[in-house]
Each structure stands twice: as C-alpha cells, then as structure tokens.
Amino acid sequence: MQEGIYDKFVEAFKEHVKTTSVVGDPFKDDTFQGPQVTKTQFDRVLSYIESGKSEGATLVAGGEAYKNVGGKGFFVSPTIFTNVKDNMKIYREEVFGPFVVISSFK
C-alpha cells in the first residue's frame, strides 16, 4: 500500500472486514467465511499468526480461533497484519486462510 494512504486504508479495510467477513455456517446465505477444511490447516493458519507476531508484524484484527460457532469446525477469525516486511514468513508464503498482510512502499 502506498505510504501516503497507508493508515487511512488500514482503518477503512479493518472496518470493512468487521462488517463483511461474517464467520459461520458455510451453508447460510449471510456467511462470508466458513471453517478451515481440516484441523491440520487450522493449526497451520494459527502457526502463521504466531510467526507474524514473533517476527514483529502488528496484529490489527483477529489472530485467534473463532469461538462463536457452537463448538463445531475449525474457524479462524479474519486476521489482518500491518507493518509487514518482505523478509517475514507471512509476507513470503501463502497462508491459505482468512489472513491479510499489508505492507507499505514509498
């Protein structure tokens, strides 16, 4: 994201995710995001979240298992990281989960 609009974009995107990314039963019409396919993938996404935190990225939203689904499924809260550098694992590798990294350039 271009440095001059970075902060404004991050705030707008965060609000958009809050109102759009409805987590829940994938068979309901209002659901935007269902569960991870397997426990292995669920654990993999959570490990990327831990990697982002430990490498110094800023967790803006999500970053945890999503619990409000009646105890069924492998749900992850929509996750947003900012201040991501190009040498970080979460920047270099595809997560395949509800996960966005935002970095800036001049």
Name each model-derived stretch.
Residues 3-106:
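NAD(P)-dependent aldehyde/semialdehyde dehydrogenase
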